[in-house]
């Protein structure tokens, strides 16, 4: 006999993912401008230090562009930079989720992200 519960767990995971997408869309609701979101893991201070350095570089390069750090609960081991547009679409500037070990591969050079941001804004 097949073990029970697998189907329900898979459905729950899909529902949770859909809810997360909806929350991200709703958090951007009423947003009238383009925003940069940095999601980083909170398990280690290295993630936070790199997120702060990246956020500072983005603010220096585009001062009119708001930068949000961890607007929702971050995923474990994540370091992502996303550009949220007013129309609800998003563009991934950097993802370090599948990178590493070593951990330093998860973090981009700030200049790389700034160049990627310029591509999407122009």
Curated annotation (Swiss-Prot):
May be involved in a redox-related process. There is a cross-link at residues 41-44 (Cysteinyl-selenocysteine (Cys-Sec)). The modification N6-acetyllysine is found at residue 20. It comes from Macaca fascicularis. This is Selenoprotein H. GO terms for cellular component: Golgi apparatus. Keywords: Acetylation, Redox-active center, Selenocysteine. SUPFAM superfamilies: Thioredoxin-like. Belongs to the SelWTH family. NCBIfam families: CXXU_selWTH. InterPro entries: Selenoprotein_Rdx-typ, SelWTH-like, Thioredoxin-like_sf. The gene is SELENOH. Disulfide bonds: none annotated.
């Amino acid at each position: 006999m097949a073990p029970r519960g697998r189907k329900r767990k898979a459905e729950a995971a899909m529902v949770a993912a859909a809810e997360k997408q909806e929350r991200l869309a709703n958090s951007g609701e009423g947003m009238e401008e383009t925003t940069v979101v940095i999601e980083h893991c909170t398990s280690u201070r290295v993630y936070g230090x790199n997120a702060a350095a990246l956020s500072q570089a983005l603010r220096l390069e585009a001062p009119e562009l708001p930068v949000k750090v961890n607007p929702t609960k971050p995923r474990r081991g994540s370091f992502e930079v996303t550009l949220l547009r007013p129309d609800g679409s998003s563009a991934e500037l950097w993802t370090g989720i599948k990178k590493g070990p070593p951990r330093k591969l998860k973090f981009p050079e700030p200049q790389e992200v700034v160049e990627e941001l310029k591509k999407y804004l122009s």
